[in-house]
Regions:
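Extended boundary segments
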Residues: 1-49, 120-122
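Short, basic/aromatic beta-hairpin or loop at an interaction surface
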Residues: 45-60
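Short alpha-helix capping/helix-loop boundary micro-motifs
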Residues: 62-69
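Short, compositionally biased
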Residues: 86-109
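Glycine- and charge-enriched low-complexity intrinsically disordered segments
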Residues: 104-124
Length: 124
């Protein structure tokens, strides 16, 4: 039996997206392991401003790369983004919304829970 990984709230990690299918393992969740050097753990609801900022920051998430199983993203897609990239977007004032219940706890090594909660769309 596989142990479910945890989110930033200490609860079971919820699915981020299966359309497009996301995650380091391409399992729909922001699961991670020590081989995930990019720490693809933030479940973000991307918007055009964030996507353009990422492209200018050197991480083009718009252009499809089927050889890597990457469809290219558009406004409104959910995607497991790199925690360090998301942290830089917060500092640059270009951060998009996030789902904290779908964001892996490892994210907290790079971004505080308070910063994440400012952009959370799944908290009451």
């Amino acid at each position: 039996m596989t142990v479910k990984q945890k989110n930033v709230l200490g609860e079971d990690l919820e699915e981020c997206s299966v359309d497009p299918v996301t995650g380091w393992y391409r399992d729909g969740c922001c699961n991670t392991d020590n081989n995930d050097l990019g720490v693809h753990t933030v479940c973000a609801k991307v918007n055009n401003e964030f996507l353009e900022w990422c492209k200018q920051d050197g991480n083009d998430l718009i252009t499809p790369h089927p050889e890597y199983g990457f469809p290219g993203l558009k406004d409104g897609d959910n995607w497991c983004v790199c925690a360090s990239s998301y942290a830089r977007s917060v500092d640059a004032g270009k951060a998009c919304s996030v789902y904290v219940k779908r964001t892996h706890e490892k994210t907290l090594t790079l971004i505080s829970i308070d910063k994440l909660k400012k952009f959370a769309i799944d908290l009451s």
